[in-house]
């Protein structure tokens, strides 16, 4: 299979569609905690409105699917600042697919597009201190730890830090060129 920006070796990134509300409605608590999105239950109508609002924004939101069309997770970009060339992203991988390289593939597809096609020069992301697998992944990908925001999220009955990671286009090309 040919590898393109949106089709990797093991998965494809596709746009979110209104019928995807069932995906957002079924996210497990661990994913929602990692995205700082643990909320009271929402009605199907509220979820549909939220998905439709997301479709109108400039940021990119993708659903990651395997070749057999199973949904692996999602990745979305935010704070896309063309003037300064910076952006951020959130990532979620569903429980049965964690630890199998899907997060790495999703991140690299988005970084490749933003750095090499849209000419952004820096990506920033924050990983919560309780998410050790994500911390290890970002370090392994060559992200630099740029700081730590103390006690920025309350979940599971405690406050946790946010670890700030960044990578420049030059670092990406050096590590993943």
Curated annotation (Swiss-Prot):
EC number(s) stated in the UniProt entry for this protein: 2.3.1.-
Positions of the N-acetyltransferase domain: 11-170
Short name of one Pfam family: Acetyltransf_3
Keyword annotations from UniProtKB, A to Z: Acyltransferase, Transferase
Signal sequence region: none
PANTHER family: ACETYLTRANSFERASE (PTHR43415:SF5), SPERMIDINE N(1)-ACETYLTRANSFERASE (PTHR43415)
Name of the protein: SPbeta prophage-derived uncharacterized N-acetyltransferase YokL
Organism: Bacillus subtilis (strain 168)
